[in-house]
Amino acid sequence: MKIIIQRVNQASVSIEDDVVGSIEKGLVLLVGIAPEDTTEDIAYAVRKITSMRIFSDDEGRMNLSIQDIKGSVLSISQFTLFADTKKGNRPAFTGAADPVKANQFYDIFNQELANHVSVETGQFGADMQVSLINDGPVTIVLDTKNK
């Protein structure tokens, strides 16, 4: 799994001008699933995301987790995280899981995450418009293959 984690003050996702998910202070996750991902990758990602201390405490230090601030998550499926740009000018996405597996794992990931924090989502496979106000900005790349 590859996940882009962005700390935000607010964010929303729309499909055809209809808002389907929105959060206030929290995290936007762009989630990519690889063919070799397992439920262990999901567990690792959920553990890291929910305990990562990337929110500021009263002294301005990044010392609080998403759980500590009672923040929310907006999770967006993003197969393009596996773009291969080595050849030519058109990216190839052969490094991404097939849509059936990716959808299944994306759902499981969001269900597991929802056991710890409030989760809003986009719609798997849809053409979405994501709006957000970055906080910091703080952007972190989590790759479950680099544990």
Curated annotation (Swiss-Prot):
- Where's the motif Gly-cisPro motif, important for rejection of L-amino acids? 136-137
Protein's name according to its UniProt entry: D-aminoacyl-tRNA deacylase
Q: Name one GO biological process term.
A: D-amino acid catabolic process
Q: What class of enzyme is it?
A: hydrolase
| Record field: catalytic activity | glycyl-tRNA(Ala) + H2O = tRNA(Ala) + glycine + H(+); a D-aminoacyl-tRNA + H2O = a tRNA + a D-alpha-amino acid + H(+)
Q: Which PANTHER family does the annotation name?
A: D-AMINOACYL-TRNA DEACYLASE 1 (PTHR10472:SF5), D-TYROSYL-TRNA TYR DEACYLASE (PTHR10472)
Question: Where is it found, in Gene Ontology cellular component terms?
Answer: cytoplasm
Its gene is: dtd
**Domain remark in the UniProt entry:** A Gly-cisPro motif from one monomer fits into the active site of the other monomer to allow specific chiral rejection of L-amino acids.
Which InterPro entries has this protein been placed in? Daa-tRNA_deacyls_DTD, DTD-like_sf
Q: Name one GO molecular function term.
A: D-tyrosyl-tRNA(Tyr) deacylase activity
Predominantly, its location class is cytoplasm
Q: Does the keyword Hydrolase apply?
A: yes
Enzyme Commission number(s) of this protein: 3.1.1.96
Pfam families reported for this sequence: Tyr_Deacylase
Alphabetized, the UniProt keywords read: Cytoplasm, Hydrolase, RNA-binding, tRNA-binding
Q: Which Gene3D superfamilies match?
A: D-tyrosyl-tRNA(Tyr) deacylase
Organism (species):
Streptococcus agalactiae serotype Ia (strain ATCC 27591 / A909 / CDC SS700)
